[in-house]
């Protein structure tokens, strides 16, 4: 980002996920280039810090997710909600508070709540290693919590390998994109520009796998 600000043709910088350190970088940029517009999405450090230098900060409602995920889990017939993450993500205030809300919401809904850890993708873990981890670990988790368990991952990179494991060993999932399902199922969609057609193709593949309704 600092290098971008050195380019006089750059008039705006957009960060889709403001990880820790972005507020400091924004502050440096503003001190040198006050004309550059700075936009931050998904702040993973205190919003107040970003607001000191960012022109606009946009964030999803983390607390609402803490209520919504358990509610969906209960609607899907789950008895247990397992929150899958790792220490780096749990150091972020928004994600940490959301987990606390999830735990409380599960209690209100009569669901069991558990937290499990998976490898942090930024630690140099390959896709193959994530695949191996989930295929080996999901067997233990399903044995521990039962097949009426819904998993929720805080990191998108976990969704595809977890879907692949759940298709084989059972369990439910929420929070993944249609493209995660397509990749896990081996569905090719490059020729399809309409997301609804991609969804239809993925659903047909799920039906063929006898897993329709198990993944949301």
From Swiss-Prot:
Pfam families xrefs: DUF3798
Annotated Gene3D superfamilies: 3.40.50.11390
Source species, domain of life: Bacteria
The protein's name: Uncharacterized protein TP_0007
Organism name: Treponema pallidum (strain Nichols)
């Amino acid at each position: 980002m600092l290098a971008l600000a050195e380019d006089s043709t750059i008039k705006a910088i957009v960060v889709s996920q403001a990880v820790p350190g972005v507020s400091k970088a924004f502050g440096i940029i503003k001190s040198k280039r006050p004309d550059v517009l700075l936009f931050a999405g998904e702040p993973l450090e205190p919003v107040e810090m970003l607001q000191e230098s960012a022109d606009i900060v946009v964030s999803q409602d983390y607390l609402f997710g803490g209520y919504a995920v358990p509610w969906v889990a209960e609607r899907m017939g789950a008895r247990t909600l397992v929150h899958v993450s790792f220490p780096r993500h749990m150091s972020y205030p928004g994600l940490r508070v959301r987990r606390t809300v999830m735990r409380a919401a599960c209690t209100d809904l009569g669901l069991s709540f558990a937290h499990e850890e998976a490898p942090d993708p930024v630690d140099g873990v390959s896709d193959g290693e994530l695949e191996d981890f989930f295929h080996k670990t999901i067997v233990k988790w399903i044995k521990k919590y039962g097949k009426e368990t819904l998993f929720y991952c805080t990191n998108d990179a976990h969704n595809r390998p977890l879907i692949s494991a759940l298709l084989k060993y059972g369990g439910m999932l929420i929070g993944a994109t249609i493209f995660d399902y397509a990749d896990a199922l081996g569905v090719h969609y490059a020729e399809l520009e309409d997301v609804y057609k991609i969804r239809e193709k993925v659903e047909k593949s799920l039906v063929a796998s006898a897993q329709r309704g198990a993944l949301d």
